[in-house]
A protein has these predicted regions:
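Single conserved hydrophobic/aromatic residue that forms the stacking wall/gate
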Residues: 1-12
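Mid-domain beta-loop-alpha active-site segment that forms a flexible
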Residues: 13-35
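Electropositive phosphate-/nucleotide-binding environments in soluble metabolic enzymes
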Residues: 21-25, 29, 55-56, 68, ...
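A structural supersecondary motif
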Residues: 36, 40-48
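A general secondary-structure signal for short beta-strands and their flanking turns/coil
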Residues: 5, 56-58, 124-125
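Hydrophobic alpha-helical scaffolding
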Residues: 17-21, 51, 133-136
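Glycine-rich phosphate/diphosphate-binding loops and the adjacent beta-loop-alpha structural elements
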Residues: 50, 56-63
């Protein structure tokens, strides 16, 4: 948000790789590449750890912001983004099960599911917490968005917004 310049994350996933000297894992390198398309040069670094779970990635995030904030402001901002879902669940099993029962063809299409009570604001400028990345639904939405943008560069956002009914405010 704005000119914020530093972010840290830890991704716990089904395999590990930590080979990039500047970014750590490919996650931060990929994110840095994305932000560079918006002329933002951010200090990004990520680590990953291998766990025996096929459900979804668990990501710890830590953001240092220029402007002061509060936990409620962070929750309000996250709630206003339809690609972000909030949850009270602490287990990937519960979130994954919700997606299988309630999601479009058993998928959660939101880009991330933030564990609401894990959000912490320290010294008014540092936000941390945990989120889950719904792997299959996340990549399905990204693939749809890339294809629609290629085919309809001037109206793709309207077409993607038509999927809004399949995003969850809460899981």
């Amino acid at each position: 948000h704005g000119d914020d310049r530093r972010q840290r994350q830890m991704c716990i996933r089904d395999r590990n790789d930590h080979g990039h000297p500047v970014y750590g894992t490919h996650h931060a390198e990929d994110a840095a590449g994305l932000f560079k398309t918006m002329n933002l040069d951010l200090d990004l670094f990520s680590s990953a750890m291998k766990v025996n779970s096929q459900y979804m990635h668990t990501v710890w995030f830590n953001l240092k912001l220029k402007e002061p904030t509060s936990k409620q402001k962070v929750i309000d901002l996250l709630s206003s983004n339809d690609r972000v879902s909030l949850t009270e669940h602490h287990s990937t099993n519960e979130v994954f099960s919700f997606g299988r029962d309630q999601g479009l063809y058993g998928r959660i299409l939101n880009q991330t599911v933030i564990v609401e009570d894990s959000i912490n604001v320290r010294n008014d400028h540092e936000v941390s917490g945990f989120c889950f990345t719904p792997q299959d639904g996340n990549s399905i939405l990204s693939s749809i968005a890339a294809t629609v943008r290629f085919l309809n560069p001037h109206s793709y956002q309207d077409k993607i917004n038509s999927l809004g009914g399949f995003f969850f405010d809460r899981v």
